[in-house]
Amino acid sequence: MKKLFLIIGAPGSGKTTDAQIIARDNADSIVHYSTGDLLREEVASGSEYGKTIDSFISKGNLVPLDIVVGTIINAIANAPKDVIIIDGYPRSIEQMEALDEKLKAQNQVQLVSVIEVEVSESVARERVLGRARGADDNVEVFNNRMQVYLTPLKDIETFYSKQKVLHKINGERMIEEIVSEMESFIKGKM
């Protein structure tokens, strides 16, 4: 059975970087997908599907549920390894419920943990505005993305706490410390 780890955190929390390092250092057993990267790859392809996605991403808005869930389920189904890390998902109660429904309806993938990388809004803002990753890294879009992240957060935390799969990590430390803690946690659950 494949084991799924979801990593959530504010924009700029470091969730993608943390997951990339862990997957790179454990390439024999762990594969990582970033929801944002999966969607950005589709946009970069220039497809009609990509243009639809871009009309949401460029404004900092959530991509429609069916597109995101389809993208995630497709990535899980085609994952070449048995341990899968997906960061940036879920970002809404609807995304959470849709994935939960899909996972309950099958027996190939087990959600092992949802890891929340915690950072303050000021640290997140400083990090995002200090990087130049894309057109979506400006103050207005950051503020929108932060609201989009914070609005459903308590409900997402409660949902996964009840399932006993929520694990919080302090994201305001040196990246080596964060990665070390996250990697130990994941390996302990493999």
Swiss-Prot record:
This chain's protein is named Adenylate kinase
Question: Which stretches of sequence are listed as region NMP?
Answer: 34-63
Matching PANTHER family, A to Z?
A: NUCLEOTIDE KINASE
What superkingdom does the record give? Bacteria
State the organism of origin: Helicobacter hepaticus (strain ATCC 51449 / 3B1)
Class of this enzyme: transferase
Q: What is its EC number?
A: 2.7.4.3
Q: What does this protein do?
A: Catalyzes the reversible transfer of the terminal phosphate group between ATP and AMP. Plays an important role in cellular energy homeostasis and in adenine nucleotide metabolism.
Ranges for the region named LID are 130-136
Could you provide one GO biological process annotation from this protein's UniProt record?
AMP salvage
Location in or out of the cell? Cytoplasm
- Cite the entry's keywords alphabetically: ATP-binding, Cytoplasm, Kinase, Nucleotide biosynthesis, Nucleotide-binding, Transferase
State the GO CC annotations. cytoplasm
Alphabetized GO MF terms: adenylate kinase activity; ATP binding
Query: Which HAMAP family does the entry link to?
Result: Adenylate_kinase_Adk
